Amino acid sequence: MTKVGLRIDVDTLRGTREGVPRLLATLHRHGVQASFFFSVGPDNMGRHLWRLIRPRFLWKMLRSNAASLYGWDILLAGTAWPGKNIGNANAGIIRETATYHETGLHAWDHHAWQTHSGHWSIRQLEEDIARGITALEAIIGKPVTCSAAAGWRADGRVVRAKEPFNLRYNSDCRGTTLFRPLLMPDQTGTPQIPVTLPTWDEVIGPAVQAQSFNTWIISRMLQDKGTPVYTIHAEVEGIVHQPLFEDLLVRARDAGITFCPLGELLPTSPESLPLGQIVRGHIPGREGWLGCQQAASAS
């Protein structure tokens, strides 16, 4: 049996309102639990449209047929009008999710984090994280114990900024296996659970066709030599490609794969995890930098 952590990112108002309820129903039908990470502040995702001038981002949008994949309400959110507050508008849905699944913070403002966190000060990072955690805790009525950086935009500064919040784990980067981020030679931070597998929008196109994606990604899960973690998005697998995701759950079960919340991947003694650090890097299929796992030593 292969155990795979299932991470569900919720970036937008529509993803929360429409995608999450469908995902909850789908997961319930198949007896699967996952980790949901919510954006709870303003939905300004449409402001990413200016990135179309960048060839890699434009190619990604064309390759994934973004207009039909996400919908124009997502692609234009927060452009001609102020972004609506996701948490306030969907508190009931978020509370229901937290009743049945591990629930953590993705971002206060997903667009702002993805665009500006790379040059924010530690204080600005802490203030933004605190705003998101406070809002999410007010909605679900219990402490937030985990987080996942929006767009995997994280580095050593983000690791340090999250330390005051006493989280059980963070999932801020791409990598191969769980690790303890090294803060100083004699100090480590909150355990990291990296995403190890590609997302739909990173690979779909000439190399991998939609109809063969599930076969392809299951093969990658079974071949993963580390601790497999897979990310889906409420805006994609919860709406347009919900049938594809349901088919994935069936195929994965038949292949001996069990999905679980990320928290279930943590060992009893986190001190046993290897040391590492998060550095800025790039991966195929994703425009811009993102946090990547790198080995480190205590010396």
Swiss-Prot record:
<dbReference type="InterPro" id="IPR050248">
    <property type="entry name" value="Polysacc_deacetylase_ArnD"/>
</dbReference>
<dbReference type="GO" id="GO:0016811">
    <property type="term" value="F:hydrolase activity, acting on carbon-nitrogen (but not peptide) bonds, in linear amides"/>
</dbReference>
<dbReference type="GO" id="GO:0009245">
    <property type="term" value="P:lipid A biosynthetic process"/>
</dbReference>
<keyword id="KW-0443">Lipid metabolism</keyword>
<keyword id="KW-0441">Lipid A biosynthesis</keyword>
<dbReference type="Pfam" id="PF01522">
    <property type="entry name" value="Polysacc_deac_1"/>
</dbReference>
<keyword id="KW-0378">Hydrolase</keyword>
<keyword id="KW-0046">Antibiotic resistance</keyword>
<dbReference type="InterPro" id="IPR011330">
    <property type="entry name" value="Glyco_hydro/deAcase_b/a-brl"/>
</dbReference>
<comment type="similarity">
    <text>Belongs to the polysaccharide deacetylase family. ArnD deformylase subfamily.</text>
</comment>
<dbReference type="GO" id="GO:0036108">
    <property type="term" value="P:4-amino-4-deoxy-alpha-L-arabinopyranosyl undecaprenyl phosphate biosynthetic process"/>
</dbReference>
<keyword id="KW-0448">Lipopolysaccharide biosynthesis</keyword>
<feature type="domain" description="NodB homology">
    <location>
        <begin position="2"/>
        <end position="260"/>
    </location>
</feature>
<comment type="pathway">
    <text>Glycolipid biosynthesis; 4-amino-4-deoxy-alpha-L-arabinose undecaprenyl phosphate biosynthesis; 4-amino-4-deoxy-alpha-L-arabinose undecaprenyl phosphate from UDP-4-deoxy-4-formamido-beta-L-arabinose and undecaprenyl phosphate: step 2/2.</text>
</comment>
<protein>
    <recommendedName>
        <fullName>Probable 4-deoxy-4-formamido-L-arabinose-phosphoundecaprenol deformylase ArnD</fullName>
        <ecNumber>3.5.1.n3</ecNumber>
    </recommendedName>
</protein>
<comment type="pathway">
    <text>Bacterial outer membrane biogenesis; lipopolysaccharide biosynthesis.</text>
</comment>
<dbReference type="InterPro" id="IPR023557">
    <property type="entry name" value="ArnD"/>
</dbReference>
<dbReference type="GO" id="GO:0046677">
    <property type="term" value="P:response to antibiotic"/>
</dbReference>
<dbReference type="GO" id="GO:0009103">
    <property type="term" value="P:lipopolysaccharide biosynthetic process"/>
</dbReference>
<comment type="function">
    <text>Catalyzes the deformylation of 4-deoxy-4-formamido-L-arabinose-phosphoundecaprenol to 4-amino-4-deoxy-L-arabinose-phosphoundecaprenol. The modified arabinose is attached to lipid A and is required for resistance to polymyxin and cationic antimicrobial peptides.</text>
</comment>
<keyword id="KW-0444">Lipid biosynthesis</keyword>
<dbReference type="InterPro" id="IPR002509">
    <property type="entry name" value="NODB_dom"/>
</dbReference>
<dbReference type="GO" id="GO:0016020">
    <property type="term" value="C:membrane"/>
</dbReference>
